Amino acid sequence: MTFAKTGFDKAEFKKNVISNCKTLYRKNFEEADKQQQFQAVAYAVKDIIIDKWIATQKEYAKQDAKTVYYMSMEFLMGRALGNNMINLTVYDEIKEVLDELGVDINVIEDQEPDAALGNGGLGRLAACFLDSLATLEYPAYGCGIRYKYGMFKQEIRDGYQVEVPDNWLKDGNPFEIKRSEYATVVKFGGYVRSYRDEKTGRDMFVQEDYRAVTAIPYDVPVVGYGVNTVNSLRIWDAEPVDTFNLSLFDKGDYQKAVEEENLAKNIVEVLYPNDNHYAGKELRLKQQYFFVSASVQRAVAQYKERHDDVRKLYEKVTFQLNDTHPTVAVAELMRILMDEEGLEWDEAW
């Protein structure tokens, strides 16, 4: 897939950086602190990406291209600003603009925290796959969790290592876009009630007495190197279906009033929670099912926006499972195809 390449306008970029600083912080660029300057630069780089991102999705839709959904518990993406400037092939030009503004590009890059979405080789492998897929211009989504703290960061206190939360989102992520229109409900627990459909004669299954959370996707651009293709890393945040129980709060049951909110928050707090106890094992399984269910539901819904026959899903959608964590996707896809789309077992399989 080939797109027409566009030039880089240094004067326009400089203007956008200065304007971003005023809009975001009510400050002139030279008056802003380093973190604020980073945000202003990052949003200006994002502006370059956006048109390519939109054009990529339009081209994929036009070609009705088969899409791969790469599911992984972690993505070790690194810092986005420098990587995006390099892949857009505008690093040197932006360095010149920042020199004119009196700031060192390396200092600006250092203001960005590492995205706490991955930890080791598994996450780095996933990130490399996404980079390669975008550079080779294959239609692809990365699918994972938008962890609030990731794992931890290390501090040395009195000569000892201390693990503290890595609050990487405290200043926001300038490259992500919240996609509330694609919010998806994920159900946990309860029981399955079966009944026979009088019209079709089929046995039907309904999940009841479950607890639900709302999965909210955030899209992060994955810029291909030297091309105009921009794919997406879609990471899911968890929010309660019912945010706040005012009735319980008014009765003084404050903990119960926010119980559903805490249930949702726990799912996305950290990568690989301690599973030396039952609660930790349960939380890990919830995390795995949470992002897998949301991703598969969205993939099927996106397919149905352009196609009527769900039996031909395999022609346009493929799922790549990174390690064992997302393998519950097999069972979840079968559930969706059978219980929601009405296929028989052999058809779904």
Model feature map: region roles:
Residues 1-349:
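A conserved ligand/cofactor-binding region detector
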